[in-house]
Curated annotation (Swiss-Prot):
Fe cation binds at residues 116, 120, 310. Signal peptide: none annotated. One of its GO terms (cellular component) is cytoplasm. SUPFAM superfamilies: Actin-like ATPase domain. One of its GO terms (biological process) is tRNA threonylcarbamoyladenosine modification. The gene is tsaD. CDD domains: ASKHA_NBD_TsaD_bac. This is tRNA N6-adenosine threonylcarbamoyltransferase. It comes from Ehrlichia ruminantium (strain Welgevonden). Its main location: cytoplasm.
Length: 348
């Protein structure tokens, strides 16, 4: 086990379209936090992998230097380097891992490869006193899944999306309506002014056992409505956005209820649900989820809204959690575009 003395971790996150660096301390203090969201993708309505990789190359060195300087530390004060090694866009992952390995080699400090989903999952423990085990729902641009979190590095998947991720569907619906990228915040804003009963959208799998998701039918239904609509005015956009959000809310409530029952059948001590990932920043969905969880005698916890999307703080905290268990990596690890959370293998 690693000493209980305060540890300082430099964290690097480049798995998608955010270039992020942070310096985090084991007493839950954030010494610096830099995030650069790449605006280059807006005109394309989604992330273009090659553009993302080039942007990481352009921004990462300066962002790392700025983050270290802002933290008041120098490299000698850093105890370990944590870096997202997957899952994600392989080009961006390679750039972040190369930077982290270079710093580790030069400073002779340990390196910790961090699973991006584990970083989202464990971040809640930086802000709330939550013990293992607990249930987590990860809803983001690339992932949608329920897992039981038994411990750091020990995860059990209960269900996941059979097709699109939830964040991906938000982005695609926004693109159909010419609302821009990212789609989630814009659709949420438009839905506030709309009538959620204007259009009926299919609630896939809602009456089936389990907690898997399917969103492709909703996406197709929205596309058909948009194609057949003669006038795409603001009222229509607000109404379809509200109907879409209402549909997603119904699906989440049903799947969460099932996941709660499944998790308690596995371990009756589980009584908390953590909801994390970019879509967890959606306040309308948070309200639906919170009511559902309370009705099931569970407690729901969310990370701070500004940390639901990708950031270096979550990678740094995951690094600290792993470091406290004595989990470090050799320099020969490779970034992974696919890395299921339940497949993590740790060594001290």
């Amino acid at each position: 086990m690693v000493s209980n003395l305060l540890k300082v971790v430099l964290a690097i996150e480049t798995s998608c379209d955010e270039t992020a660096v942070a310096v985090v301390r084991s007493d839950k203090q954030v010494l610096s936090h830099k995030v650069l969201s790449q605006k280059e993708h807006v005109v394309y309505g989604g992330v273009v992998p090659e553009i993302a990789s080039r942007a990481h190359i352009n921004y990462l060195y300066d962002l790392t230097s700025q983050s270290i300087e802002e933290s008041g530390c120098d490299l000698a004060d850093i105890d370990a380097i944590a870096v997202t090694s997957g899952p994600g866009l392989i080009g961006g992952l390679i750039i972040g891992v190369m930077m982290a390995k270079a710093i580790s080699s030069v400073t002779n400090k340990p390196i910790i490869e961090v699973n991006h989903l584990e970083a989202h999952t464990l971040l809640i423990r930086m802000f709330h006193d939550i013990d293992f085990p607990f249930l987590v729902l990860i809803i983001s641009g690339g992932h949608c899944q329920f897992l039981i979190v038994h411990d750091v590095g020990c995860y059990q998947r209960l269900g996941s999306s059979l097709d699109d991720s939830l964040g991906e569907v938000f982005d695609k619906v926004a693109r159909m309506l010419n609302l821009g990228y990212p789609g989630g915040p814009i659709i949420e804003q438009k839905s506030i002014m709309g009538d959620s009963k204007s259009f009926f959208l299919p609630r896939a799998l809602i009456n089936r056992f389990g907690c898997d998701f399917s969103f492709s039918g909703i996406k197709t239904a929205v596309r058909n409505i948009v194609v057949n609509q003669k006038y795409i005015d603001n009222d229509f956009i607000c109404n379809i956005s509200a109907s879409f959000q209402d549909c997603i809310g119904d699906i989440l409530v049903n799947r969460i209820t099932n996941a709660i029952h499944m998790s308690q059948a596995i371990n009756c001590k589980i009584n908390k649900l953590v909801v994390t990932g970019g879509v967890a920043a959606n306040h309308l969905l948070r309200n639906r989820i919170s009511i559902c969880v309370k009705d099931n005698n569970f407690e729901v916890l969310y990370p701070p809204t500004e940390l639901c999307t990708d950031n270096g703080i979550m990678v740094g905290w995951a690094g600290i959690e792993n470091l406290s268990k004595g989990y470090v990596s050799n320099l020969d690890f490779a970034p992974k575009a696919r890395w299921p959370l339940e497949s993590i293998k740790r060594s001290s």
